[in-house]
Amino acid sequence: MMPFDFTADISVEDASALAKNLGINHSEISIKEMFESFNKGLSKSFEGLETDKTEENLQSRCRGVTLMALSNKLGYLVLTTGNKSEAAVGYSTLYGDTAGGFSVLKDVSKTLVYELSNYRNIISNVIPQRIIESCLLYT
């Protein structure tokens, strides 16, 4: 997990619960220093400009760079989380959300992702409901 200043504690708790429910080992890696380095490096180019989505997208890109470095070092394959609906409308951060070797949900619509998530939870609550509900806020 790579929380940042704006990551709610409850989001970290839910992600940890999901990893535990799936039997996935996880750790927490700070992206704060990397993010600050990017901002410092870009400060002259951004001078006089308002803070906007650019800085928010840098967080995602820091996560993507970190995941790709771990992938290269450890021989893992990074899976992206984008789905068919997001790809169709361009709702993603290039080199952030899209950083990875395979998109498991590439042919699955966002509506079906929610249906599959809820279906998976019928037998046992593997995916914390707050994760599903919070994703609905960004549609």
Can you say where each PLM-predicted feature lies in the sequence?
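A conserved beta-strand->alpha-helix junction
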Residues: 1-54, 60, 130-136
